[in-house]
Amino acid sequence: MSEFSIIQQYFNRPCQETDLGIGDDAALISVPQGYQLAISTDMLVSGTHFFPDTAANHIGWKAMAVNISDMAAMGAEAKWATLSIALPEANPAWLNQFSAGLFECAEQFGVSVIGGDTTRGPLNISLQIMGVIPRDQALTRHGAQLGDEIWH
């Protein structure tokens, strides 16, 4: 199965709030005036971040959720994500379950997958997330103060 057929069959969904979404060499987005773009990336490696026999839909959900959590921690609204995935093989059943979990989480939080990359290799998933936050309103680690609540 080719990279383009994997993208078309499992990851090509309508994109919200983009000027150009998935399917080209790059996506185009516009950030509203008065906002900043927040960007974060997390990688999940089979055998390190999840057991090799973990259900694919759970892996997809987790890949999106850990990134959305980073946006929330900064006070940003998650909007867009790009997915890079290395697969040992293009298993249609696994890809169907993985993409179902990924998009279930994405849709719950209003995130559009706007691009990415696929290649052959040991199972590795890297998701980059982008969001918006009103200018100079980011909640940074350096802004924490004695008495602030910490959630985990």
Would you name each region that the model predicts?
Residues M1-A55, M74, K79, L83, ...:
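Extreme N-terminal cap/leader segments of soluble proteins
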Residues G23-D25, V31-P32, S46-T54, K62, ...:
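Surface-exposed loop/turn and secondary-structure junction residues enriched for glycine/proline
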Residues L37, L44, E77-H152:
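Glycine-rich anion-binding loops of enzyme active sites
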Residues A63-M74, C105, F109:
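A short, N-terminal amphipathic alpha-helix
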